[in-house]
């Protein structure tokens, strides 16, 4: 099935996350999966990475959580030995209960069984604050988070700006 007319609602370049809006169709509903609490993830826990690695559709890789606190560029990742290759990064990392515990993000080139996923706590923060990450193709700062979400123009009313001395 091919889905067209997908819109980018929000994006975060630093986390490599995007929120997409799918068109509504009366004859089709989209399934959803729960996001697990990050605090419940344990080392040794079985996990499953789903995606299309190397263009092979509908592929599942199994592994275990190696650590829940692997740091890169100021972010903590879930490290797993489930295979994460080009094509399945960006897919869900599930626990045995079918709950998403992370979004597969990267693997180490030349290193087998070294995969990493963004924990759901970052995903939940991104979703809660999606207005701060709102996508605007005409804005070069799209996807950058501001300390306070920038006001958006609505109904033709410009945002109020404060003067500084």
Regions found by a protein language model. Name each.
Residues 1-51, 55-58, 73-77, 132-137:
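Conserved active-site neighborhood of the chymotrypsin/trypsin-like protease fold
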Residues 6-8, 65, 93, 100:
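Conserved hydrophobic positions within beta-strands
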Residues 8-10, 67, 105:
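A residue-level detector for short acidic-glycine micro-motifs
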Residues 19, 59, 92, 117:
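Short aromatic/basic micro-patch
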Residues 22-23, 50-52, 82-83, 103-107:
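Active-site-proximal beta-strand/loop segments in catalytic clefts of secreted hydrolases
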Residues 28, 53, 100-165:
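C-terminal cap/linker of serine protease catalytic domains
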Residues 60-71, 116-118:
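Short, compositionally biased
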Residues 83-104:
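Catalytic nucleophile loop of clan PA
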């Amino acid at each position: 099935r091919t889905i067209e007319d997908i819109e980018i609602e929000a994006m975060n370049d630093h986390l490599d996350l995007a929120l997409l809006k799918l068109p509504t169709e009366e004859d089709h509903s989209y399934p959803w999966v729960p996001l697990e609490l990050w605090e419940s993830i344990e080392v040794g826990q079985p996990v499953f990475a789903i995606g299309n690695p190397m263009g092979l559709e509908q592929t599942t890789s199994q592994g275990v959580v190696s650590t829940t606190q692997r740091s890169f560029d100021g972010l903590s990742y879930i490290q797993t030995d489930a295979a994460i290759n080009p094509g399945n990064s960006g897919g869900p990392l599930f626990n045995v209960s079918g709950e998403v515990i992370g979004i597969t993000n990267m693997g180490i080139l030349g290193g087998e069984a070294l995969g990493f996923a963004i924990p759901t706590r970052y995903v939940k923060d991104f979703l809660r604050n999606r207005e701060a990450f709102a996508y605007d193709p005409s804005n070069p700062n799209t996807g950058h988070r501001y300390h306070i979400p920038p006001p958006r123009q609505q109904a033709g009313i410009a945002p109020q700006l404060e003067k500084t001395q």
